[in-house]
Design a protein with these regions (language model features):
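Active-site cores that bind ATP or allylic diphosphates and position pyrophosphate for catalysis
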Residues: 1-34, 41, 171, 176-177, ...
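Catalytic adenosine-cofactor/nucleotide-binding cores of aminoacyl-tRNA synthetases and other
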Residues: 5, 9, 19-168
Length: 208
């Protein structure tokens, strides 16, 4: 192409820059029109904050492939993003990280760095109940409030329920008779006493 451009059009051809494919981790194949495996921005925005998507592109050289992760690799990506963003805010980031962050940050408002892994793990335990999440965060020494984790809460819930449902904690809708029938007499009595105590008395979440 370079020779043709020069000899026929007397024009110096532009330098070719090849781009690697973007992978889809947690799914089979690569993102390509020829394979029919494509992701829309709307799909990615169900699990990624916009800045994290831009960060993945900004930190990757054109000739280096990277993955959009639908498996637990996404938690590592959020962790790495948070680490770089924190160093950027604190002024300890090197020039490379500063350039990346300047390329991917969209708004002047600061991003709330509530760990995505915590939202997934703890959110699953309390069924993503906001009040209970705030209580649990306070109990473990990280008193995040809803205003701080609201931007990521829906993303964490969507990812867990749609991309990693096998890791979700679910309360049984009915009694697990299989387990109950394997209990001995003392164990069944203990379960009955616990049920009676909880049902006949009112307890706050704090007391429990």
């Amino acid at each position: 192409a370079g020779v043709l451009a020069k000899k026929i059009f007397d024009y110096e051809a532009t330098i070719f820059q090849g781009y690697e494919f973007i992978g889809i981790k947690g799914s089979t194949g690569k993102m390509s029109g020829s394979t029919g495996l494509n992701l829309t921005p709307a799909t990615l925005l169900n699990i990624y904050q916009p800045e994290v998507i831009l960060w993945l592109y900004a930190k990757s050289e054109p000739n280096k492939a990277f993955d959009f992760c639908f498996d637990d690799g996404i938690l590592r990506q959020y962790f790495e993003f948070d680490k770089q963003y924190k160093s950027y805010l604190e002024g300890t980031a090197d020039e490379y990280v500063r350039d990346i962050m300047n390329s991917c940050l969209m708004f002047e408002e600061k991003i709330k760095l509530v760990p995505m892994s915590h939202l997934v793990q703890l959110g699953s335990i309390v069924d993503f109940n906001v009040d209970m999440l705030e209580t649990v965060f306070a109990k473990i020494g990280t008193p995040y409030r809803y205003e701080e984790f609201k931007d990521r809460l829906g993303l964490a819930k969507y990812w867990l329920e749609n991309c990693s449902p096998e890791n979700a904690n679910k309360l049984c809708p009915v009694r697990n008779w299989k387990v109950y029938n394997e209990l001995d007499g003392k164990e069944r009595e203990a379960v009955s006493l616990l049920h009676k105590e909880l049902s006949e008395n009112e307890y706050t979440l704090e007391e429990l």
